[in-house]
Design a protein with these regions (language model features):
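ASCE RecA-like P-loop NTPase motor cores
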Residues: 1-405, 419
Length: 419
C-alpha cells in the first residue's frame, strides 16, 4: 500500500474563523469524538477548512454530498488542494435508470432498463482501487455510496499480483483474468485483455492504460505499460497488482456454494407458490431463476446478479450489504456535506427500495433473498461510522443532537461529542 501523506498545495492560508475551526475539529478527532458539526454558509471556505483538517489527521476520507453536481464540484476542489494524493469521484453510473418493477393493479411488469456512463464506471473503479491501495485518499461520493457494491474481501482476494521473474502458466493466467470478469478480445477497451503468443495485454477498468505482460520459458520476463489512446510507452515495472474488472466478483468455491443455496431457495419458493395455488408465479420464478443459474455457471455472471448478492457475498438474511464504506480501513473519516439535505436522503433510501421489491417477490419475479440487494438502513450506516463531521449552514435535528451543536450567527462554530 502506498504510504504517501496528505499535503495541501495552496497559495492561501486559513483566515478569519478558519484557523479556530481547523484547530477545534482536529482536536476533536484526535480526542476520539465521533460526531462533530462545522457550521458555515456556502462560500465560507468549508472545503478548504476540511482539507486542512484532513491534512492534520492523515485519515482516508469519504465525503458524501447530496447530489452528483455538488460531488463533482467538491472533488475538483479537493484535487486542487491535494494534487499528489488520490481524490476520486464515486456516484451512480447510470445516465438512465428504470428499475425493475411490477404494478399489480394493471398486471404490468417493467423490466429494468439502464444506460451506464462508461467514464463514471471507470471513476468508480478508480475509487475502489485507490481506497484499497493507499492511505492518502479522499473519495467524494453521492448518497448512492450506501448501495451494495460487492465484497471488498473477495475484490482484494481475487486480484492478481504479478512480478518479474515469477513462474507463470500462460493458460492459468488467462483463466484467472476470465474469473476476474475480464473479457478476452482482439480489440482492447476497459476490462478487456488480449493474448498473442507469449504476450498478454490487459486494460484495467480504472485507467486508460494497458499493462503488457511478456512471458518467456514460463516466467514473467517483462512488465510494461503504455497509454491506450496515444500508444506512448509509460515505462517498465517490477511488479503490478491487477484488480477485478467488476465489483461483484466471487471466488469459485464461494460461487458454487452460492449457486447451491440459490437452487435450494428456488425449490422452496416454487413449493410455496404451488401450495398456495399460485401456479403462474411458480412457473415464472422457476424459469427466470434457472436462466440466471445457467448463466452464472457458464460465465460467473448474469444480468441482475446483484439480486443474489446475499449468497454471493456470504451474508446472513437481513445482514447489511457491503458498500463503498466497507472498502475503507477501520480508522477513516466521513464528511457529510450539506448534512441538512444529505442525512434525510441517507435515512429514506431503504424504505422506497423495500416497497418496490415486495411486489416483485410476491408475484414471482424475484426470490425473497432479493430483499437483501438494497441500500444500507440508516441504523446500519451509523454503525459503520468511525468518526464523522457534518457540514451545513443549517444543521438538522439529527446533527444537532448527535454533536451537541447549536447554530451560531457567526459561522463556523464547531461542537462535538464522543457518541
Amino acid at each position: 500500500m502506498f504510504d504517501n501523506k496528505f499535503k495541501i498545495s495552496s497559495k492561501f492560508k486559513p483566515d478569519g474563523d478558519q484557523p479556530r475551526a481547523i484547530k477545534q475539529l482536529t482536536a476533536g478527532l484526535k480526542a476520539g469524538q465521533k460526531f462533530q458539526t462545522l457550521l458555515g454558509v456556502t462560500g465560507s471556505g468549508k472545503t478548504f477548512t476540511m482539507a486542512n483538517v484532513i491534512e492534520n489527521v492523515q485519515k482516508p476520507t469519504l465525503v458524501i454530498a447530496p447530489n452528483k453536481t455538488l460531488a463533482a464540484q467538491l472533488a475538483q476542489e479537493f484535487r486542487t488542494f491535494f494534487p499528489k494524493s488520490a481524490v476520486e469521484y464515486f456516484v451512480s453510473y447510470y445516465d438512465y435508470y428504470q428499475p425493475e418493477a411490477y404494478i399489480s393493479s394493471t398486471d404490468t411488469y417493467i423490466e429494468k432498463e439502464s444506460q451506464i456512463n462508461d467514464e463514471i464506471d471507470r471513476l468508480r473503479h478508480a475509487a475502489t482501487v485507490a481506497v484499497m491501495s493507499r492511505q492518502d485518499v479522499v473519495i467524494v461520493a453521492s448518497v448512492s455510496c450506501i448501495y451494495g457494491l460487492g465484497s471488498p474481501e473477495f475484490y482484494e482476494e481475487i486480484s492478481l499480483s504479478l512480478k518479474i521473474g515469477e513462474a507463470v502458466d500462460r493458460e492459468k493466467l488467462i483463466k484467472d483474468l476470465t474469473e476476474m470478469h475480464f473479457l478476452r478480445s482482439e480489440y482492447l477497451s476497459r476490462g478487456k485483455f488480449r493474448a498473442h503468443g507469449e504476450t498478454i495485454e490487459i486494460m484495467s477498468p480504472s485507467r486508460e492504460i494497458v499493462t503488457r505482460i511478456e512471458i518467456k520459458e514460463d516466467k514473467i520476463k517483462k512488465i510494461s505499460e503504455y497509454n491506450f489512446l496515444t500508444g506512448e510507452a509509460l515505462g517498465n515495472l517490477e511488479k503490478v497488482l491487477i484488480y477485478p474488472a467488476k465489483h461483484f466478483v466471487v471466488p469459485e468455491p464461494v460461487l458454487e456454494e452460492a449457486l447451491n443455496q440459490i437452487e435450494k431457495e428456488l425449490n422452496e419458493r416454487v413449493a410455496y407458490f404451488k401450495k398456495n395455488k399460485k401456479l403462474l408465479e411458480a412457473e415464472r420464478i422457476y424459469r427466470r431463476t434457472k436462466q440466471d443459474l445457467e448463466m452464472m455457471r457458464e460465465i460467473g455472471y448474469c444480468n441482475g446478479i446483484e439480486n443474489y448478492s446475499r449468497y454471493l457475498t456470504g451474508r446472513a438474511p437481513g445482514e447489511a450489504p457491503y458498500t463503498l464504506v466497507d472498502y475503507f480501513s477501520k480508522d477513516f473519516l466521513i464528511v457529510v456535506d450539506e448534512s441538512h439535505v444529505t442525512v434525510p436522503q441517507l435515512n429514506g433510501m431503504y424504505n422506497g427500495d423495500h416497497a418496490r421489491k415486495k411486489a416483485l417477490i410476491d408475484n414471482g419475479f424475484r426470490l425473497p433473498s432479493a430483499y437483501d440487494n438494497r441500500p444500507m438502513k440508516f441504523s446500519e450506516f451509523e454503525k459503520k461510522i468511525n468518526q464523522v463531521i457534518f457540514t451545513s449552514a443549517t444543521p438538522g435535528k439529527y446533527e444537532i443532537e448527535k454533536s451537541s451543536c447549536r447554530p451560531h450567527p457567526n459561522p463556523p462554530l464547531i461542537k462535538g461529542r464522543e457518541a
